[in-house]
Design a protein with these regions (language model features):
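Compact, glycine-rich, soluble single-domain proteins
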Residues: 2-136
Length: 136
């Protein structure tokens, strides 16, 4: 049976006006928040505890940092044009800077999906997996 994850009803306040969507693979589906505005992209998941983290998509994002994070996260790098996973960096601890795979990712084509630590593996999100993205 496929794994399904939904966003909690009591999302942190910073996500109140953010867009939401669902990603589906052959084995899983999960909801996520879309960080499409600068203030939300800047703040992201920083300052949230492990139990408060939610999946967060950062469109047009070739690098991420975990400065200000209180818990480890997974980052799944997506090719936005093909909706395919390029790579996954798992269990990234706070105070790290990570770039998308490849020497120079195509500008605007890469997206980063931040997840609570362990979620990428639990949802079967690895290189080569195709996602079907559905706006909520």
């Amino acid at each position: 049976m496929p794994t399904a994850r939904t966003l909690p009803a009591d999302l942190p306040r910073r996500f109140a006006r953010a867009g939401r969507a669902t990603a589906r693979t052959t084995d899983a589906s999960f909801e996520f928040v879309v960080a499409d505005r600068f203030p939300l992209r800047l703040r992201g998941l920083a300052g949230l505890g492990a139990g408060e983290l939610v999946p967060l998509l950062l469109p047009r994002c070739g690098s991420i940092h975990t400065f200000g994070m209180r818990a480890a996260i997974d980052v799944v790098w997506l090719d936005s044009e093909r909706a395919e996973i390029l790579a996954a960096d798992t269990e990234l601890p706070p105070r790290r800077l990570v770039r998308a795979p490849g020497a120079r990712p195509a500008r605007g084509r890469i997206a980063a999906l931040e997840l609570p630590a362990g979620e990428a593996e639990a949802l079967g999100l690895g290189a080569g997996v195709a996602l079907r993205l559905v706006p909520s």
